[in-house]
Amino acid sequence: MAMRVDFHTHIIPEDIPNFIERFDGERWPVLEKTCSCGANIMVAGKVFREVTDQVWSPQKRIQDMDAEGVDIQVLSPIPVTFSYWAEPIAAEEMSKVQNDFIADTVKQYPNRFIGLGTVPLQDVEVSIREMQRCIQELGLKGIEIGTNINGKNLDDPAFTKFFEMAERWEVPLFIHPWETLGTERMPRHNFMYTVGIPSETALAAASLILGGVMERFPKLKICFAHGGGSFPSILPRLDQGWHVWPHLRQTTKPPSYYAKSFYFDSLNYDALNLKLLIDRFGFEKVVMGSDYPFLLREIPPGKVVDETLELTDEQKKAILGENALTFLNIKIGEGLES
C-alpha cells in the first residue's frame, strides 16, 4: 500500500503565550479554551475560528491519522499567526514559539510528523535569521509563508534577499493564502474561504512569475496550498497577456515556462480539477494535502487522488507520498531524520 503523506496540515501550541500582554497590538491570536478538548482562536476580541484539540494535540492527530490511513503529517502554522503586521522583534518571538513547538512535536514522534517553520517576513533580515535557525538548529524541513506581506505581493523587491537565501540554502517554501484580496466584498457566505483563497493564491503564483522572481531564482522550491487556487485555470490567460503586452514583460519566457517548476497540493475537491493540475504541471509536481484539521478539509486525505481513475497506481503512489518527500529534500527510504 502506498505511503500517505498529508502535506497540508496546521498546528498551534496549546499553551501559546498571550502576546497582547507582552507587546503592543490587539491582532495577536489568543487561544481561549472552551473545554478540555475545544477552544476559540480570538483575534481583536472576536472569535476568528473555533477549533478542537486536533489542532494542538499530537496524540489526537495520530489517532485521526491511524483512522484515516495517513502515515505522516507535515505540520505548519495556522496563517493567522504569521503576524506580519507586528513589530519585527515581536513577530520573531511569535515565530520562535511556534517553530520550537513544531520541532519538539517532530522530535517526540519522528516517524509520524515533519515540520515546517514560519518567519517574520515584514523584516527580511530577521526572517533570514529565523529561517536559518529553523533549518540548521531545529531540523525543520521548510518554511511556510503567506501569499502577501502587508499587502505587498511576493515579487516586491523587499523580499528578494529572502528568496535568494532560500534558494542558496535549498529551503522548500510552502505558500499559503492569508488576508485575501477583496475582503471588503467577501463577508457573506464565507466567500473568503471559497472565493478569496483561490484568487489570492493565484495572484501570488502569478506575481512570482511575472515579477521575475522565478527567472532570477530558478532553483527555488515552491509549493502552493489549495491546489494553487485558480492559478491552473488562468495560466493560459497569463500567457496570452505576456504575448500581447510585450512592454510589460519582466521575463524572457512566458509564464507557463516558469510555472512548471511549481509544486501544488491536491486540495481541489474534484477529480476534474485534479486532472487539470496534473495535465498542466505533471503528476510529479502534486503532493497530497487535506487542510487538516479544519472544516473544509478533505476526508479522508487523498480521497480525490484515489477516485481519479485516469491515474496509474505508480502516479497515485507518487502523489500520495513520494512527491512530498522529494519536495522536502527527504530521500525516500532513508528515514525522516535524514
Positions of PLM-derived features:
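Mid-to-C-terminal alpha-helical segments outside catalytic/metal-binding sites
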Residues: A2-F7, I12-I72, D100-Q108, R129-R133, ...
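Hydrophobic faces of well-ordered beta-strands that scaffold small-molecule active sites
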Residues: V5-F7, Q73-L75, I114-G117, I143-I145, ...
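Catalytic metal-binding/acid-base residues of hydrolase active sites
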Residues: H10, N148, W178-E179, G228, ...
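Active-site gating loops and adjacent loop-to-helix segments of metal-dependent hydrolytic enzymes
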Residues: P13-D53, L181-T201, L238-S261
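Acidic-and-aromatic substrate-binding clefts and catalytic sites of carbohydrate-active enzymes
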Residues: V51-W56, S83, L121-S127, N150-P157, ...
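Active-site gating/metal-coordination segments in enzymes
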Residues: D71-A205, G211-G212
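Short acidic/glycine-rich loop or secondary-structure boundary segments that cap or lie
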Residues: T183, F231-L235, Q240, L272-L274
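Active-site region of glycoside hydrolase catalytic domains
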Residues: L208-K221
